[in-house]
Amino acid sequence: MRSTSASGWRRRTARARSSRSRRSSDLKGALRPLNWGWICVIAGPIEQKQTIFLVVGLVACAIVSLPSYRYFAVLAWPAYLGAIGLLVFLLLPFVPESIVKPRNGARGWIDLGFMDLQPAELAKIAYTLAVASYLRARRGSTRTFLGLVAPGVLTFVPIGLMIKQPDLGSAMLFAPALLAMLVVAGARLGHLFLIVALAAMAAPAVYPMLESHQKQRIIGYVGQLRGDRSTASDINFQAFTAQSLVGAGGVSGQPDAKARALVHFNHLPERHNDMIFAVIVCRHGQRGGLMTLGLYGLWVLGALLTAWVSADRFGRILIVGLVAFVAAQVFVNVGMNIGVLPIIGITLPFVSYGGSSLVTVWIMTGLVLNVGLHRTGGPVRRSGGYPDDND
């Protein structure tokens, strides 16, 4: 009797475990389409952690999309100051490395125990909210050079702190975001072109201030453009390896086992992170790469259409700033992987491994949805050189 009872208990326990395993597999299967990276990178602890980050991101997206986005205008300045405070905290010399974890020579992450927080990611959202809030309150001020000073200061503060880490990749994304928001706010294009031209002429002066590894990347990139393969085994190893994997993918990609073998034996650094687009193309070919870019295109188009139909100045500027961040990040990351841009350490939104990056881009998505759900008025009309408001 005891034997029969024990046998029945074991069968029920086995069925329960099997059921939990199926539910876990079903959850991962349902979430995988939301993250192309899992299709291409070997599963394991990374996949489990990224599943958690994705769930957190989706929950954050839903929460952010519920209250009217106008409430976030009130939180813009505290959020901006908080983000600046975190960026300053990273640079404090007395903070131990057990808390601020250096990676590749950069002090850009705070160890929270369960995850590493990257303040530069959160700063993108806080910065966009702050600039959008400022430009809404200063309607028409951007028509003059003097009116561009304050948005410029708001931009250069986080840029300077990120360069100091050093995190040149994240810092570079703030310039296109600022330009996009100023255009929507009604700034004169002639003024913006002049500022861009002056910045381009002043760019060489920044070179001496770069870290040695950043200078090496630029030197390697110039050599790469000239067809010099002598650095393929040292400073350009990552770039040439990524390009070889992109070429190996061809039009239709490689079978799963062969693609994994190619990625493994070529020892591509950061294959789950900055260089994941090369892995996608190796596995799914040019078709998979174009499909990935097409999905980003749909996200950008949907966000811009949401901005177009909103008659609220803050909402429009906010969306365009967020779109500029995502679009610029995709452009730079893909450019790094195919060899048209130098490698500067930028993740691929929605795809690369990393909790801060993934949660941030889903919060951005939630803000875009929020503007769409709480929009007022109709398509944007222009009057007097800058958009009308319905604040």
Residue ranges of model-derived segments:
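N-terminal membrane topogenic signal
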Residues: 15-17, 23-30
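Hydrophobic alpha-helical transmembrane segments of multi-pass inner membrane proteins, especially
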Residues: 29-238, 278-338, 363-367, 382-391
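Extracytosolic (periplasmic/ER-lumenal) interhelical loops and adjacent juxtamembrane/interface segments
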Residues: 239-255
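Long extracytoplasmic/lumenal interhelical loops at the membrane interface
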Residues: 251-287
